[in-house]
Amino acid sequence: MKTAHEVRPGNVIMFEGSPWVVQKTETTRSGRNAAIVKLKLKNLLLNSGTETTFKGEDKIDDIILDRLDCTYSYFADPMYVFMDAEYNQYDVEAENLGDAAAYIVDGMEETCQVTFYDGKAISVEMPTTIVREVIYTEPSARGDTSGKVMKPATITGGGTISVADFVKVGDKIEIDTRTGEFKKRV
Amino acid sequence: MSTSSNASHWDIFCTVVDNYGDIGVTWRLAKQLVNEYHIPIILWVDDLNSFSHILPTLNPKLVSQCFNGVIINHWTTPLAVPYLPGKVLIEAFACELPDEVKLQLATLHKTAPQAVPLWLNLEYLSAEDWVDGCHGLPSMQVSGIKKYFYFPGFTPKTGGLICERELFAERDAWQQDPANKLQLFESLGLKDIQAQDSVFSIFSYETDSLPALCELWQARAKNDAKIHALLPKGRSLNSLQHLLPCPVDALMPGQQIKLGDLTLHILPMTDQQGFDRLLWSCDVNIVRGEDSFLRAQWAAKPFIWHIYPQEDDYHLIKLEAFIRLYCDNLAPDIADTWSKLNFAFSQGQQSAVKTHWQNLNPVSLPLLQHAKEWPIDAINAADLATRLVQFVKKS
């Protein structure tokens, strides 16, 4: 069991006898600091999609599937190809990467976890923390250094995340892949 | 009194966290569902003492009683009154249902799935964009039952806002005759308030903003009409302790504290109808939380929202989201000042609160006109109870 807070893209959860791969998680704050977690899911048996919402502390029945540490090799549209330590290659559908696709870049060295269901690679879980370079963001608007004023930034790989106002083009930043949040400049 | 089995009834479970907010919302909803839709409602509340402050005739010692057609059960652990599944089950504001209720639902799901009530989580009100995308989504529970998230909100894609059918008509009738407000003040034991005086109600959390405003009102009142600030015993007064002749606990309803031409009045507790009328009768209302915040909007009067503080100042994001909606049709200069006043108040910025209050002149005609038009825009053709009933029908 996991709490909804702990679920992250790439996890597989069980509901009504079917396994669902988590493609996207979105955590927002409700009143009195309570969290709401919205999940985008894909049914691994029926290939259908759905969206669902949980309270942050709700328990979710996750299933442990076979996993392998792999590194990203290349993109062969529409498949991302990963490779394990023994040079076996695994294709993962781009759609199944969900939010993780925004963090995939050529030459990345981070080790990802590829999850298998019925012998087929179905999803990829990124490391909790990654470092990416900011390739575009507007200059600081207000000179705020508190870190609370946020602005959009495009990172290597093409994804867009909210970063602190003081972050500049060329800065390397740490990102929490579970939430897509900017952590700090490194 | 015991709860009878009635498959058509709805259960609403509410835990009282901050005295009058959660119970205020659920009590209004329960009454409206009974009055306007004739739905039998059982309201389960864990703190009847707090509830009795807004429903003075409630007996906190009884496990079950009935008011306004709503059966009110004391939510004890374990439950003193057995839970009998109805048509709908609402857990209000992310409260955790009693174990025996969850167990019954799980058992029903296995043995008679058609008898499982529609399970809803009624969430907090927010004007943030993400609410549109989360409203009405099912939540897959481990038991196999789907629970639906129901989000109140300001757009057509949300669950709407609590507003009784006749509320606006009653308010308009009340506000048309100035004698009504003077009679109300008198009935509340508030003395020496004249028709031309400025009257502000204050129902906030503790904040440095209040002493700043009082200082401003004291100075300003010397040249203008008298100013009266109406405050219930509670958190607002904690911020004004240095202006009071005795500890807050020793203050009596109806007591006046004169500070030059500013008079602080201690309000008695009142029921929800009385609170609505108070908001209708004041020139500006300072409110907090969710229930009073919404009722201040329905009052069609200028207001300041002292939003419930959250970690990492997340409440300021919620405040900004509401301000964006509220100011959509407001003249830019007024919108800017009203926005700054609200932010400054919620952050306890004394100097800024005074500056923006003076710049805004909250009793000015354009802001008042906007306050009158806003409720019609905000309600978006259907209130929360109406949309809730439609949601249940479709589910």
Curated annotation (Swiss-Prot), chain A:
<dbReference type="InterPro" id="IPR015365">
    <property type="entry name" value="Elong-fact-P_C"/>
</dbReference>
<keyword id="KW-0648">Protein biosynthesis</keyword>
<dbReference type="InterPro" id="IPR012340">
    <property type="entry name" value="NA-bd_OB-fold"/>
</dbReference>
<dbReference type="InterPro" id="IPR013185">
    <property type="entry name" value="Transl_elong_KOW-like"/>
</dbReference>
<dbReference type="InterPro" id="IPR020599">
    <property type="entry name" value="Transl_elong_fac_P/YeiP"/>
</dbReference>
<dbReference type="GO" id="GO:0003746">
    <property type="term" value="F:translation elongation factor activity"/>
</dbReference>
<dbReference type="Pfam" id="PF09285">
    <property type="entry name" value="Elong-fact-P_C"/>
</dbReference>
<dbReference type="GO" id="GO:0005737">
    <property type="term" value="C:cytoplasm"/>
</dbReference>
<comment type="similarity">
    <text>Belongs to the elongation factor P family.</text>
</comment>
<feature type="glycosylation site" description="N-alpha-linked (Rha) arginine">
    <location>
        <position position="32"/>
    </location>
</feature>
<dbReference type="InterPro" id="IPR001059">
    <property type="entry name" value="Transl_elong_P/YeiP_cen"/>
</dbReference>
<keyword id="KW-0325">Glycoprotein</keyword>
<dbReference type="InterPro" id="IPR014722">
    <property type="entry name" value="Rib_uL2_dom2"/>
</dbReference>
<dbReference type="InterPro" id="IPR008991">
    <property type="entry name" value="Translation_prot_SH3-like_sf"/>
</dbReference>
<protein>
    <recommendedName>
        <fullName>Elongation factor P</fullName>
    </recommendedName>
</protein>
<keyword id="KW-0251">Elongation factor</keyword>
<keyword id="KW-0963">Cytoplasm</keyword>
<comment type="pathway">
    <text>Protein biosynthesis; polypeptide chain elongation.</text>
</comment>
<dbReference type="GO" id="GO:0043043">
    <property type="term" value="P:peptide biosynthetic process"/>
</dbReference>
<dbReference type="Pfam" id="PF08207">
    <property type="entry name" value="EFP_N"/>
</dbReference>
<comment type="function">
    <text>Involved in peptide bond synthesis. Stimulates efficient translation and peptide-bond synthesis on native or reconstituted 70S ribosomes in vitro. Probably functions indirectly by altering the affinity of the ribosome for aminoacyl-tRNA, thus increasing their reactivity as acceptors for peptidyl transferase.</text>
</comment>
<dbReference type="Pfam" id="PF01132">
    <property type="entry name" value="EFP"/>
</dbReference>
Curated annotation (Swiss-Prot), chain B:
<comment type="similarity">
    <text>Belongs to the glycosyltransferase 104 family.</text>
</comment>
<protein>
    <recommendedName>
        <fullName>Protein-arginine rhamnosyltransferase</fullName>
        <ecNumber>2.4.1.-</ecNumber>
    </recommendedName>
</protein>
<feature type="binding site">
    <location>
        <position position="272"/>
    </location>
    <ligand>
        <name>dTDP-beta-L-rhamnose</name>
    </ligand>
</feature>
<comment type="function">
    <text>Protein-arginine rhamnosyltransferase that catalyzes the transfer of a single rhamnose to elongation factor P (EF-P) on 'Lys-32', a modification required for EF-P-dependent rescue of polyproline stalled ribosomes.</text>
</comment>
<feature type="active site" description="Proton acceptor">
    <location>
        <position position="22"/>
    </location>
</feature>
<feature type="binding site">
    <location>
        <begin position="19"/>
        <end position="22"/>
    </location>
    <ligand>
        <name>dTDP-beta-L-rhamnose</name>
    </ligand>
</feature>
<feature type="binding site">
    <location>
        <position position="205"/>
    </location>
    <ligand>
        <name>dTDP-beta-L-rhamnose</name>
    </ligand>
</feature>
<dbReference type="Pfam" id="PF10093">
    <property type="entry name" value="EarP"/>
</dbReference>
<keyword id="KW-0328">Glycosyltransferase</keyword>
<keyword id="KW-0808">Transferase</keyword>
<feature type="active site">
    <location>
        <position position="290"/>
    </location>
</feature>
<dbReference type="GO" id="GO:0106361">
    <property type="term" value="F:protein-arginine rhamnosyltransferase activity"/>
</dbReference>
<dbReference type="InterPro" id="IPR016633">
    <property type="entry name" value="EarP"/>
</dbReference>
<feature type="binding site">
    <location>
        <begin position="288"/>
        <end position="292"/>
    </location>
    <ligand>
        <name>dTDP-beta-L-rhamnose</name>
    </ligand>
</feature>
